Amino acid sequence: AQSVPYGISQIKAPALHSQGYTGSNVKVAVIDSGIDSSHPDLNVRGGASFVPSETNPYQDGSSHGTHVAGTIAALNNSIGVLGVAPSSALYAVKVLDSTGSGQYSWIINGIEWAISNNMDVINMSLGGPTGSTALKTVVDKAVSSGIVVAAAAGNEGSSGSTSTVGYPAKYPSTIAVGAVNSANQRASFSSAGSELDVMAPGVSIQSTLPGGTYGAYNGTSMATPHVAGAAALILSKHPTWTNAQVRDRLESTATYLGSSFYYGKGLINVQAAAQ
């Protein structure tokens, strides 16, 4: 049997599914640790690896990318879980190794691949405490080329009035995503700061894991693919909308939850965003 993870319902994705919008013809690059393409609940259409020691993008030694991918696009079938945009086209862009770490040069190469291969949405459930000029340049290039870029705000919690949002989420051109639980409370680990844009479910998120299995993870890494999937749903309903329009709709229709320093504009509501 197939279960619908709570986060899918919390962002109101099923309302769009019932209208017939499931992300068809929208290309989503999962810039991460790879995706296990043999998983029966995933359909990976392509990809590339920029990790010198791990050349196969369709293997995922850390399980992180496979989990992220399932939240975006786990198939609507009789097994496992359901993703936000189950018909969207997943691309595995490996920039993190099996320990979950990577170099900015690998990430930059992955973003360049996404631009060259006409991706519509980029999911970056990754980040670090310092940025780089080259990273900012390529992220801005992706956005100016029309791609919706969702990035994890980070799992550093809050630190008084100091921003704990990581890079690349801290760059204004990205949609910086924080995490809430099923009761719309901010996760204690979710980074805070003026750069935070929106919130999505990121606590006990059930999704796909390598080897045809499933499991629950926590993190802003789990919240971000809800936003990437939401962007794919919106674009499948409104294929002529620009990335700026998609972002504006996600932010302007979000449900207010509290101070923007901790919650950004609030919880995304993809049903309202895609009106």
Swiss-Prot record:
Provide the E.C. number(s) assigned to this enzyme: 3.4.21.62
Q: Which family does it belong to?
A: Belongs to the peptidase S8 family.
Q: What cofactor is this protein dependent on?
A: Ca(2+)
As for what it does, the entry says: Subtilisin is an extracellular alkaline serine protease, it catalyzes the hydrolysis of proteins and peptide amides.
* GO biological processes: proteolysis; sporulation resulting in formation of a cellular spore
> Which major enzyme category is it?
hydrolase
Q: Name one Pfam family in it.
A: Peptidase_S8
Q: Which residues form the Peptidase S8 domain?
A: 5-274
Listed name of the protein: Subtilisin
**Additional facts recorded:** Secretion of subtilisin is associated with onset of sporulation, and many mutations which block sporulation at early stages affect expression levels of subtilisin. However, subtilisin is not necessary for normal sporulation.
The alphabetical list of record keywords is:
Calcium, Hydrolase, Metal-binding, Protease, Secreted, Serine protease, Sporulation
Q: Which reaction does it catalyse?
A: Hydrolysis of proteins with broad specificity for peptide bonds, and a preference for a large uncharged residue in P1. Hydrolyzes peptide amides
Q: Which GO terms describe its cellular component?
A: extracellular region
Q: Which SUPFAM superfamilies match?
A: Subtilisin-like
Q: Give GO terms: molecular function aspect only.
A: metal ion binding; serine-type endopeptidase activity
The record lists Ca(2+) 2 as bound by: 169, 171, 174
Can you tell me which residues form the catalytic site?
32 (charge relay system), 64 (charge relay system), 221 (charge relay system)
Subcellular localization, as worded in the UniProt entry: Secreted
Query: Cofactor binding mode, per the note?
Result: Binds 2 calcium ions per subunit.
